[in-house]
Amino acid sequence: MSGSSMYKTKLCILFNKTGDCSRPNCTFAHGNAELRRPGESSFTGRRHNMDSDLRDRRHNMDSDLRDRLGRQFSPERRPSLDRSGRRVQRFSGHDNSMPFENRRDKDYRENRRFDERRDYAGGLKVGNRIEDRAEDGRNKFHGYNNVLEEQLKDVEMDVKMLTDDKLRLEASVERKAHEVDILTSRIQELETQLDREKDECRRITSSSKKFVKEYNRFLRAQDDLKRSEARLQKLGNQLSTYLAGSEGNNRDVGLDIVSDEETNGRNLRTACDPHNELQNTSSLSRKKHYVDQYTTKEPVEDGLIGRGEEEKVENEKKRPPCWNMLSSKSYSEEESGAWNDEDTINRSSSKEDNWKRRRFSIGTSATDKVILSTSMAAREFDDVAESEEENPEAANGSPLISLPPPPPFRDAHVQRDEDDVNGDVMEQKKAYDDDSV
C-alpha cells in the first residue's frame, strides 16, 4: 500500500545496465513506463480519493446507520424478551434472500477495508484526510530515503568494485614493472655477453690470420730448405767427383809450366843432391796444394740453377779444365819432344825449379826485381808450405784438404774470368823464363 503511493522518479541502475533487476521490492522505475512525475502522481491520488467517496455514499444509502457507523466496537444486538420469556423478533423491513449473518459478515469486511484509510464518522472525515495526507507524506519521504539508501548502496558497491579493480590493476602494473626490470637486466647481460663474444671472435680471427700467414711462411721455408738440401747434395757430389778426377790433372798443370831448358839442365843436379830432392818433394806437395786452392775450376752449376741455363751447366761439365786447355795449347810442341819418361822428368824439373826460385827470391832485393801478382801468391804459398815442413806432425794430423769457400755467383762473366786466368798463367811462364835467364 505504501509502495503504490511512492513516486518512482529515478531509473534503476541495475535494470539499465543488465536489463533485469533481481530485487523483488525495487523502488526504482524499470523503464520510462514506470517513471512517474509528482503532478501525475497527485492527480492520480486525488482521483482515487474521489472514487472512494462515491462508492461510500452509494453504500451508505442502502445500509443502516448502525451499519454505516461500523460495529466492530459495538456490542452484539440481542432481541428483547416478552413477558413469557421468549425472544421477540422485531421487524427489520422486507425479508431478504441473504441470511442476516452473511450480510453482516459482508458489511463487516467492507467496512473494515474502508476504515483502514478513513473514519466514516461525519465529524472525523476532514481530520482523517489530513492525517492520511501526512501519513502519505511520511511514506513518500520514507520511500525517498529508501531510494537514496538503495542508490547509496549501489554507489558503494560500484566504488568497492572499482577499488578492487584498481588494486588488481596496481598489482598487475607492479608485476609488469618487475618483469620489465628483469627483462632489462637480461638484455643488458646479453649485450655484455655479445660484446665479449665479438671481442673473442675478432681475437680468434686475427689469430687465425696470423696462424695462416705463419703456416704459409713455414711451407715456403720448408720448400726452400728442401731445395737447399738438394742443391747442397748436388754440390757435394759434384765437388767429390771433381776432386777425385782432378788429382791426376794437377800434376800435369804444374809440369807444363816449366820450360824445356830448365828441365834438361837440372836433371843431373837433382839426381845427385839428396837435400835438393827432399826440398823438391816438399815443393811438389806445395804446388799441388796451391793448384788445388787457386786453380781448381769452380762449378758454375750453382749460379745457373734456377735461371733456366741447364745447357750451360752441361757444357761446363763437358768442357775440359782451363789449365789443361792452356797446357795443351802452349806446350803441344814440347810434348812432341824426345822424352820417353815424361812424368819422371817433369816431376824432377818441377822440384828443381821451385828450389831455384826460392833461392833466387832470397838473394834478390825488392828494388832490383818486380814481383808479379801470381809470383806473390806463390811466395805466400811457399811460406805456408815451409811452416808445414817445420811441423810435419800437424801436417800429418789433417790428411784431408780443407775445402775452398763457397764459390761466388758466376754468370756471363765466367768466360772473361777464365781468360784473365789464362793471361796470368802466361805471365807466370814469362817470369819463369826470366828467372832462368
UniProtKB/Swiss-Prot annotation:
Record's keyword terms, sorted: Coiled coil, DNA-binding, Metal-binding, Phosphoprotein, Zinc, Zinc-finger
Biased composition regions of type Acidic residues, renumbered to the chain: 333-343, 383-392
Molecular function via GO: DNA binding; zinc ion binding
Renumbered zinc finger spans (C3H1-type): 6-33
Record SUPFAM superfamilies: CCCH zinc finger
Coiled coil: 145-244
Pfam families with a match to the protein in the record: zf-CCCH
Chain positions with Phosphoserine modification: 259
Residue ranges with Basic and acidic residues bias: 48-85, 307-319, 426-437
Region (Disordered): 35-107, 266-360, 380-437
Name of the molecule in the record: Zinc finger CCCH domain-containing protein 40
Organism: Arabidopsis thaliana (Mouse-ear cress)
